[in-house]
Amino acid sequence: RGECHSGSKLLHPVVHLHVFNSQGQVYLQRRPDWKDIQPGKWDTAVGGHIDYGENPTDALRREVREELGITDFTPRSLGKYVFESKKERELVYVNTTIYDGVISPSTEELAGGRFWTIDEIRAALGKDIFTPNFESEFTRFIS
């Protein structure tokens, strides 16, 4: 992980999950201020690295359990793409699910989270509230 975020631009695989409720709202996590990448910004509900030898589906289930405490959900793949910033380059496997159950954000990995309406997200785009990769995925896969 450290090597991938050091500015080496080493392409590494990650999983993302966009969690919608049945009202069409999107759950976003707030990144803790201590994170090295995009601290304090609102981001995709779940995001994490795929471990060596792990497949994307297993990585997604592990990350969702670790970050939000959700174990029973049905993911749907939206595709994959390469995201590149000044510090990193990721092969992102993008997924979505509809979930109305209890969400328990990890206090170790996240600074909380909440559901946003699509209109709230659209109004906040480009205002340095969200991570660049969330904004990219929102415009590419969701809006």
Model feature map: region roles:
Residues 1-16, 22:
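Acidic, metal-coordinating catalytic segment for phosphate/diphosphate chemistry
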Residues 14-46:
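A glycine-rich, hydrophobic loop/mini-helix early in the fold
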Residues 2, 79, 86-143:
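Nudix hydrolase/Nudix homology domain
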Residues 5-9, 34-38, 113-114:
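A short local loop/turn or secondary-structure capping micro-motif enriched for an aromatic residue
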Residues 27-28, 45-77:
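The catalytic Nudix box helix
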Residues 9-11, 38-40, 87-89:
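A generic structural micro-feature
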Residues 1-3, 31, 82:
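Short clusters of small/polar residues that mark proteolytic maturation junctions
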